[in-house]
Design a protein with these regions (language model features):
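Select transmembrane alpha-helical segments in multipass membrane proteins
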Residues: 5-16, 41, 77-91, 125-131, ...
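Membrane-interface loop-to-helix entry segments
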Residues: 141-170, 345-358, 370
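Loop-to-transmembrane helix boundary motifs in multi-pass membrane proteins
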Residues: 238, 242, 296, 310-339
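Hydrophobic alpha-helical segments and their helix-loop junctions in multi-pass secondary transporters
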Residues: 93, 97, 160-186, 203-204, ...
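Helix-loop-helix connectors at the membrane interface of multi-pass transporters/channels
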Residues: 32, 102-124, 218-222, 299-325
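Membrane helical hairpin/interfacial module
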Residues: 36-126, 131, 135
């Protein structure tokens, strides 16, 4: 049974990491660190359980059953189809894909626009940016088996280096002053961190990514089913380790900056303050590049996953046509109506996450018994 070399395993692990690590993953840890203060360690343990361990277990569970269809289908074929369709639509074109464009626009473009921009001009700029963003993402997503070449070998290393630069800059710039935890964290930091990690909803994304990661593993020459499952599991473990490191580093940034920024609403404000304090005007460029890369990686990964799944579900419609449909739909939503879609979809996502957790452990237990 052929296996990947250590170098290629790292590439696949980087690729999976990049598909998980979007804007939300950048925002939650710094806010947790700032609010948890002296209780950051137990809070981070809670967050890592739901934001890293559960998604990694979901990847393993899906890999052991050779796909979500087989895993969910072991309960009932109708459940497999309905649940998978809902996951791909909600984590894909209805929510996450359009949000990658709108979030990266807010962080990579808006800070450089003058205050005199009218609402109409800003909307036009947003549409132009989103159109360009999705054209590039669609071109990259045309070849899902080559994601490893761009995301794994280029984009993720750049992203990790830039995050490391910010981390080192903050550690050098700010004294180690840890303030007391906010009232919401005192006495139950672990539980609060658990809920924070739950909000990333990466366990749902984990069900999506297995097929595309398997394609990239097969492109390296591993064709055996057991071999692909083994390498997918290793990729899940590798991506999980990377996520733990990055989450811990960005949470520590929040801890160090908490005494300076005061009360904040989200982690974006903390990161923006940190890079500006450390790097001045260049900090805007740095944080803009980081958010663009993170959002672009997730966008491409989700476009590939959703298009591949629906092509498998409805073979008469080609992968390319599904890709165009999801790209155009996501472009429209990113320009207008995203908040309304989020208001409708987020309650549904919160219902689906417990089902995903139960399905993950069901798959692990079922496979062990077999």
């Amino acid at each position: 049974m052929k296996s990947l070399s250590m170098r290629n395993r790292c590439v696949i692990g980087f690729t999976l990491f990049s598909m998980f690590f979007g804007a939300g993953n950048l925002i939650f840890p710094p806010l947790l660190g700032a609010e948890a203060g002296s209780s950051t360690i137990p809070a981070m343990v809670g967050m890592l359980l739901t934001a890293v361990v559960l998604p990694a277990l979901a990847v393993i569970s899906v890999a052991k059953h050779d796909g979500l269809k087989n895993l969910a289908g072991s309960i009932h074929p109708a459940f497999a189809t309905v649940y998978a369709v809902l996951i791909h639509l909600l984590i894909g074109p209805f929510v996450a894909i359009p949000r990658t464009a709108s979030t990266s626009f807010e962080m990579a473009v808006v800070p450089f626009l003058s205050d005199g921009f009218s609402a109409e001009s800003l909307l036009i700029m947003r549409c132009i940016y989103s159109f360009t963003f999705f054209v590039i993402a669609t071109i990259v997503a045309l070849k899902p088996t080559r994601l490893k070449d761009l995301l794994g070998k280029v984009m993720t290393p750049i992203l990790l280096i830039l995050i490391a630069v910010i981390f080192v800059g903050v550690v050098v710039k700010f004294p180690t002053v840890v303030r007391q935890a906010d009232a919401s964290y005192k006495g139950h930091a672990l539980q609060h961190g658990f809920v924070t990690g739950y909000q990333t909803m990466d366990i749902l994304a984990a069900f999506n990514f297995g097929a595309v990661i398997a394609m990239n593993i097969e492109a390296f020459g591993v064709k055996n089913r057991k071999g692909v499952a083994k390498e997918t599991i290793l990729a899940g473990i590798g991506a999980g380790i990377l996520l733990c490191i990055v989450y811990s580093a960005t949470a520590y940034i929040g801890v160090l900056c908490s005494s300076k920024v005061g009360n904040v609403e989200n982690g974006t404000q903390i990161l923006t303050y940190a890079v500006h304090a450390c790097f001045g005007i260049y900090g805007k460029v740095l944080i803009g590049i980081i958010f663009f890369i993170a959002c672009f990686n997730v966008c491409v990964g989700l476009l590939c996953c959703c298009s591949a799944y629906f092509h498998e579900l409805v073979p008469k419609i080609s992968y390319f046509k599904w890709l165009l449909v999801f790209s155009v739909f996501s472009f429209v939503i990113s320009c207008a109506g995203l908040n309304a879609i989020l208001n409708v979809s987020l309650p549904i996502l919160k219902v689906m996450c417990p089902i995903a957790i139960a399905l993950t452990f069901y798959g692990l237990v079922r496979h062990k018994r077999q």
